[in-house]
Amino acid sequence: FMRSAATVHVKQNGSIRDFYVKEALSYIEQNFQNDISIEDISASCGLNRSYFGKIFHDTIGRSPQEFLISYRMTKAAELLKITSLSIADIGNAVGYPNQLHFSRAFKNVYGISPRNWRNENKIE
């Protein structure tokens, strides 16, 4: 009964969904540099993965995985622009301990390698 009452409330005004999504965004912001999974994020909200994925996508417009990758790559781009940290160190700092995986993910998002992106965007 409690879950169905909550579901009715969500359909009426969305405030419970907003709460869960804000909790998830806060968790991502605080933990993106760690090896976190969508299960970890959904568990931090007290939800199962499939329900969490649906409300997150309905609210944000993309899957939790897409959002996490985008968030990490935005942070990586900031670090590439303003620091002289190595590509490996930046990958590590944004949750990619494997430099090859980081470089591939970065290139998927930006269409260019982290090294080339840095060369084109570095603040001197």
Residues covered by each model-derived region:
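Hydrophobic/aromatic residues within well-ordered alpha-helical segments
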Residues: F1, R72-K75, T83
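Hydrophobic recognition helices of helix-based DNA-binding modules
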Residues: F1-A5, I28, F56, L80
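An amphipathic alpha-helical interaction segment
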Residues: F1-Q12, I16, Y20-E23, L47, ...
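Sigma70-family region 2
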Residues: S4-H9, Q33, H57-D58
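Alpha-helix N-cap/loop-to-helix boundary motif
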Residues: N13-I16, Q33, S37
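Pre-recognition alpha-helix immediately N-terminal to the DNA-recognition helix
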Residues: F19-Y27, L68, T74-E78
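Basic/polar phosphate-binding segments, predominantly the helix-turn-helix DNA-binding elements
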Residues: Y27-E29, D35-Y71, L85, G91-N116
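Generic C-terminal helix-cap and adjacent flexible tail
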Residues: N119-E124
